[in-house]
Swiss-Prot record:
GO BP term, example: RNA processing
UniProt-listed Enzyme Commission number(s): 2.7.7.8
Domain S1 motif, residue spans: 625-693
UniProt similarity note: Belongs to the polyribonucleotide nucleotidyltransferase family.
Subunit structure: Component of the RNA degradosome, which is a multiprotein complex involved in RNA processing and mRNA degradation.
Cofactor(s), names only, from the UniProt record: Mg(2+)
Keywords recorded for this protein, A-Z: Cytoplasm, Magnesium, Metal-binding, Nucleotidyltransferase, RNA-binding, Transferase
Limits of the KH domain: 556-615
One of the record's GO molecular function terms: 3'-5'-RNA exonuclease activity
A Pfam family it matches: RNase_PH_C
EC main group: transferase
UniProt protein name: Polyribonucleotide nucleotidyltransferase
Amino acid sequence: MLNPIVRKFQYGQHTVTLETGMMARQATAAVMVSMDDTAVFVTVVGAKKAKPGQDFFPLTINYQERTYAAGRIPGGFFRREGRPSEGETLIARLIDRPLRPLFPEGFVNEVQVIATVVSVNPQVNPDIVAMIGASAALSLSGIPFNGPIGAARVGYINDQYVLNPTQDELKSSKLDLVVAGTESAVLMVESEAELLSEDQMLGAVVFGHEQQQVVIQNINDLVKEAGKPRWDWQPEAANEALNARVKALAESRLSDAYRITDKQERYSQIDAIKADVIAALQAEQAEGDALDENELGDILHAIEKNVVRSRVLAGEPRIDGREKDMIRGLDVRTGVLPRTHGSALFTRGETQALVTATLGTERDAQNIDELMGERTDRFLFHYNFPPYSVGETGMVGSPKRREIGHGRLAKRGVLAVMPAADRFPYTVRVVSEITESNGSSSMASVCGASLALMDAGVPIKAAVAGIAMGLVKEGENFVVLSDILGDEDHLGDMDFKVAGSREGITALQMDIKIEGITKEIMQVALNQAKGARLHILGVMEQAINAPRGDISQFAPRIHTIKISPDKIKDVIGKGGSVIRALTEETGTTIEIEDDGTVKIAATDGEKAKHAIRRIEEITAEIEVGRIYNGKVTRIVDFGAFVAIGGGKEGLVHISQIADKRVEKVTDYLQMGQEVPVKVLEVDRQGRVRLSIKEATEQTQEAAAPAAPEAE
């Protein structure tokens, strides 16, 4: 019989329910988590044994949204869900990041977490619900896992922190921050902000971590009631003899190698050392004994980590010779590509980004159909990380999870300074091509995007820059590193990325690999990051200190006019015939909004003027008594239809063609013939009565010479 176990608790303004034991009983663990009608079903399956030769931890997080959750049927030919959307990929990464550090070192059994959104309240985002569910399912499973974690979203509305704000509340919030952590430590932060201070951001992190303790407590209580026995797993005992031998062979040489400042040269030397160590050990092996290269790789990595970390903690120069708070050399160039609307090449040490900005019309905006509803995105940010950027070969194709995640982070860094649509009615696409990478290419993308946008003439509110910080901590001793290299990222305890302007922070991302990161350490890191950010902004401002006064000659110029909403149908025409003909005739792009706003986009100013003139003709009111030049469009037995200004058509009755009786209309008029017509009447239905006879008489009278005056 089914025996569900349920826990309910209040979490901010929402009620959260955790339920297990009802579904998916063949999975290692399963839990249904709901928060005010948004429900996510999360399962965990773990392999009891690791695959032979497995040298990494194969954790897979799948997050999937089902359209039935919102009472909808999927679009597309097959009418079913397909590959993960960008949003699903980003939430999968959000779940993964705080969970991965909590699995013990040496645990390489395959683990898969699947989170399926099965019901959605449009006001409650499923991401926090899915994170809570993944934490609960792993805690229930008995798999070696040092959790649970809690997760919270924090908003900042009217100078107050708000726990798990609704979607409507987020629209007026200056902050959208997600924080996850254990009972004692923050592990992950992801956020975007509207130029908030370091203290405000840190306060939000602390607030979110404090509030999520209720989640951790309730998961612990659920585990006591329904948890499976903890797996009897122990890490393999270290091979002390091999450790000592490898250390003797490699430590001093690796220490010297990590003084080589050039990345490629350093890597070549490290590869040579590893090859020499393998050769030496193989020569010492007894015949028939095989060398475990995975184990050897782990030992060498531990030695490298110790070499770099001990040097930093001792106050010695870093791998490339810098002090802890030094930024690598900067090279900033704008306008590097002649035909793009805006471009920049941003180089920081061995990290380089070629960034472009392209302006388009509203038609170029991305329509996104999400579970939470449809929305239109006018600012697109795409990040590409080709294999040549790190001197490797590899597959080139659709973006991978990492590229999607880095692109979103860089976009968050710039979003707060983008102009409003009513001030700058363009769709903007930024593309960052990473041409070299050795640490923090996403933050180089933020800097490059700011430069390219200003080069394109986009009136951003302020220049923004980004910086990646690192941390090395042993006991109470810690050092915060500015502008970390790739090696410092891998061998350190924290990856901490901050983007912002001189005024405040626009994006903060934090991934912490250890416990014990205190508020004071985060404060030091944020303040040090501010100094680095201001330094980079100073160098950027020497290249370009304000948006260009005009957009590129190759960019479409958008001209806006207003027409009466009643006239929209006239400009569009039957089945779009009029607007289609207008765009072809003028070579422009024309978009009409429901309030009568008309936007004409053209790269040629004369074409735009022509389009505006034609629209004004079409929407002009017809004046009774006025004479127009018209063109015969149809001939019928009882008269002829004549098109006058603005594509409007009126009827010339057979009695109004000439000043004598007309038996046959075609005796007087031909298709396409241009004739003067006078407007006799416009009835309530908008039908127009015209007269050629009166127009001709009036024209002749005006042209006749005046009679001589009597003497």
